[in-house]
Amino acid sequence: MIRFIGFYDYTVILTYISLISSVYGITQAIHQDYKTAIFCLAFSGFCDAFDGRIARTKKNRTEDEKNFGIQLDSLCDVVCFGIFPALICYLLGVRGFPGLLLVFFYCTCAVCRLAYFNVLEGNRQQTEGGCNKGYRGLPVTSIAFILPMVFLFQFFMSELAFLSLLHLVLLVVGFLFILDFPLPKPGLKTILSLMGVLAVSVGIILIYTKYRLPPHTDRTSHIVEEVEELFEDIYETETP
């Protein structure tokens, strides 16, 4: 009988879907399809908001299943809400030495927060169990709500102002990831309200970009061309 490592039941399916959505979004961001990338980021945030609730519906979960869920969620969050949004900001123009420092800072803060959360959650599960009632610092999932809101501003402000805003978002949000302050966990009504606002925002982005794509979103075309030329050079070098 063939056996696989890991768990693949309904308690972790949303986490896997969230990861797939973000990986697909990364490919679309590289090809400058930012509206699809933002949609994928928002969808990953939606999945992350409900994966824990779904997992807790299974009453007979083993300790291995619980611990696997905690580790899997954080590892996927590194991609979905750490690397993915930082890449979007980079491709939108957060570059140069200051921009790269902010990208590194944001990713490091996200990873640090998730690792620290795993330690705290593992200890809490052993002593208390059940659902966590609050957060310490800003959850990384919040970027799935913040970045689509920020993305809307590019349609109504200058390129310089928009890029400055992206720099500020990476700095402030990254800092809030690691700042130790109590934050109540939102209830179901609050989550649904935020999802509604997010859905409207993504809808506006999809409709607006269908009729008008801001000129400064073309600024990354040369990046794609340089990457393609690099692979062509490598192929030609290795081909006898």
Regions found by a protein language model. Name each.
Residues 1-52, 174-215, 231-235:
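Topogenic membrane-insertion module of multi-pass membrane proteins
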Residues 3-13, 67-75, 131-136, 160-164, ...:
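Short, amphipathic, aromatic/basic-enriched membrane-interface segments that mark the entry/exit
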Residues 11-16, 57-113:
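Multi-pass membrane catalytic core of lipid/isoprenoid biosynthesis enzymes
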Residues 14-20, 40-43, 79-82, 104-108, ...:
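Lipid-exposed faces of alpha-helical membrane segments in multi-pass integral membrane proteins
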Residues 24-39, 79, 83-104, 149-165, ...:
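Helix-coil boundary and interhelical linker segments in multi-pass alpha-helical membrane proteins
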Residues 56-61, 111-126, 175-185:
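C-terminal ends of transmembrane helices
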Residues 127-240:
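C-terminal membrane-associated helical module and adjoining short loops/tails
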